[in-house]
Amino acid sequence: YYQGFVMGLQCISRKGLAAREDLTQFAEQVRQFASQMGAGVAVANADAFMQVAEPMDELCVRVDQTIAIHLVSRESVSGREIKAALESLKFELDAGIFWYRDVHGKNLFNAVNLDSTPFIAAALDDQAYRGFSMLYDLTKVPAGEKTFNQFMDLVVKLSSHLGLDLVDDQLNELSTQWLKDIRSYVVERQDEMLSVDIEPGSELAERLFS
């Protein structure tokens, strides 16, 4: 049997910070449950909680960034070539997205269609594409330059193998300085996460940024 337990409400996610009304409703439900069980209950103070939660939510908004590098053909590239190049680097197609996983099977990086429509396995062999995008969700990968350098190594290999240009969201060709700035930006945002004991790529980060 149990002498007691804790009931919790996730108040911070990619949907934003829970409203005070949600906290009030949750507290009332907990009290009703405790009453039915003939148990005592201690509910956290909503004002004190919000004083902590609001700056935490602001930090999460600030660090919740996905870096996109687009690999674009000046004409077109066949789906067969894209698939072969990605699979040669251990990417696997799953639900319309090519995923790159670590040795434990955890998703690290992904490649998506340039127009955001899913890659369809049956159509890849016969379809031509303008290109694809490589995505780096800095909240979901281990912290540090090493992981970003691994990502960029894959990007450069794919670009070289397929003869594709590397461009940003405005289709401007990437410069060496841009890449240095992005690397620094990633490290700074991940350091912010670590400063509040949220390890990028951890179970807590997965839950917060869901």
Predicted regions and their residues:
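Membrane-proximal, solvent-exposed terminal domains/tails of membrane-associated proteins
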Residues: C60-A68, V72-V77, E81-S210
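Short, solvent-exposed secondary-structure capping/transition elements
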Residues: G16-E21, A42-V43, G79-R80
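Intrinsically disordered, low-complexity linker/loop segments enriched in Gly/Pro
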Residues: A39-D47
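A short mid-domain helix/strand-loop element embedded in enzyme catalytic domains
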Residues: A46-D64
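Extended, low-complexity intrinsically disordered regions enriched in serine/proline/glycine/threonine
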Residues: Y1-F5, S13, E28, Q32
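Short hinge/gating elements
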Residues: L9-G16, Y136-V141
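Conserved glycine-bearing catalytic or ligand-binding loops at nucleotide- and phosphate-handling centers
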Residues: L17-F26, V30-F33, M37
